[in-house]
Amino acid sequence: MTTVADILKYIESIAPPYMAESWDNVGLLCGRKTKAVKKILVALDPFRSVIDEAIALGADLIVTHHPLIFGEELKAVNEDTETGRCLLTLMEHGIAAINAHTNLDMAPGGINEVLAQKLALVNIRVADPSGTDAEGRDWGLIRMGEVPEQPLENFLNRVKTLLGCEGLRYVNGGKPVKNVCVGGGSCGGFVSEAAKLGCDTFVTADVKYNQFRTAYELGVNLIDAGHFHTENPTMPILAEKLRREFPGVEVIFSENHRDVMRFYSSFQIVGNAVPGIPCGRLSKKPYFRKLCRGDH
């Protein structure tokens, strides 16, 4: 009989808790370790839609990257908060919840290593190792590697296509792409370190205004590919690892969990013009020249 404790032990073997940031909340956040597990649902987030899916499937355990309890001082488990309502639902249906968050970001074969592989980087390595694991492998947050030198536009298309993004936010640092750093999720604060490491391009998500400005001043191509799209590629891989480790357990990758963020633009390119705005007026600025040419 496979138990929650068995699943937890395995997950912590590939993403040890000591790799997690001190402020993080990882591991078993809901449920009993002794509970038998016959069916697992894997998803990036423990959102309501994922919990409802787990109930419909009859899952015993949800395994996610992001923690259900995070960044809040939870003083009561009741219906006053969404976290409380989710916890109550899980407990009422006997569903346990495990997450591997920043420990999975840091771990060999984790979030950022998979992101680097997904973008077809070569010579992938930990940019600034935090330590070595029991097998002597470096671990740490940021990964770096190389691609054949190419124009930024080509690499943007690669990122958008390979990660399945609806759109990208980016700053053109004025250099072709060759040496690339990646950090899934909210790693925009590492742009200065990326520059010091000699990277001309940094792919991450949740980038702030001042981080884009810093990248521009440092001459780094900074690409925001979205939190979901930079982290979710690891989750089906984790699901497959669980299937191999526990062949007697049914492991299902969530079909309902999707990125809820969408891009909206009020501009609609028709032919060579932005409707209602003469191209002569727009052509004074490089960005709008691109709009007028239709190669945005």
Task: Go through each PLM region and give its residues.
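Hydrophobic structural segments
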Residues: 1-271, 276-296
